[in-house]
Curated annotation (Swiss-Prot):
The keyword Heme does not apply. Belongs to the cytochrome c oxidase subunit 6A family. Its main location: mitochondrion. InterPro entries: Cyt_c_oxidase_su6a (IPR001349), Cyt_c_oxidase_su6a_CS (IPR018507), Cyt_c_oxidase_su6a_sf (IPR036418). Component of the cytochrome c oxidase, the last enzyme in the mitochondrial electron transport chain which drives oxidative phosphorylation. The respiratory chain contains 3 multisubunit complexes succinate dehydrogenase (complex II, CII), ubiquinol-cytochrome c oxidoreductase (cytochrome b-c1 complex, complex III, CIII) and cytochrome c oxidase (complex IV, CIV), that cooperate to transfer electrons derived from NADH and succinate to molecular oxygen, creating an electrochemical gradient over the inner membrane that drives transmembrane transport and the ATP synthase. One of its GO terms (biological process) is mitochondrial electron transport, cytochrome c to oxygen. Residues 50-97 are mitochondrial intermembrane. This is Cytochrome c oxidase subunit 6A2, mitochondrial. The gene is COX6A2. It is a single-pass membrane protein. It comes from Pongo abelii.
Length: 97
């Protein structure tokens, strides 16, 4: 006895069901405008308030940091590729801008 073959249809696909996504889209739109956008604005404002200039920490010449066994192949050989004079010290200390 042979089993009846069903036609290949998309019976479980969401496109086959009607009126499926209306409530979910409304919920996510509400969450975006009520929760996400004010949170981004609040974080931006907080970042703006705390964006003042902070003094550099005191330089401490630790023996295990900033070891140069051979020079870098660019520049003077002492600065790293993405060296920032305001943040990154050299082995001898901070640079004076």
């Amino acid at each position: 006895m042979a089993l009846p073959l069903r036609p290949l249809t998309r019976g479980l696909a969401s496109a086959a069901k009607g009126g499926h996504g209306g409530a979910g889209a409304r919920t996510w739109r509400l969450l975006t405008f009520v929760l996400a956008l004010p949170s981004v604005a609040l974080c931006t404002f907080n970042s703006y308030l705390h964006s003042g200039h902070r003094p550099r920490p005191e330089f401490r010449p630790y023996q295990h940091l900033r070891i140069r066994t051979k020079p870098y192949p660019w520049g003077d050989g002492n600065h790293t590729l993405f060296h920032n004079t305001h943040v990154n010290p050299l082995p001898t200390g901070y640079e004076h801008p």
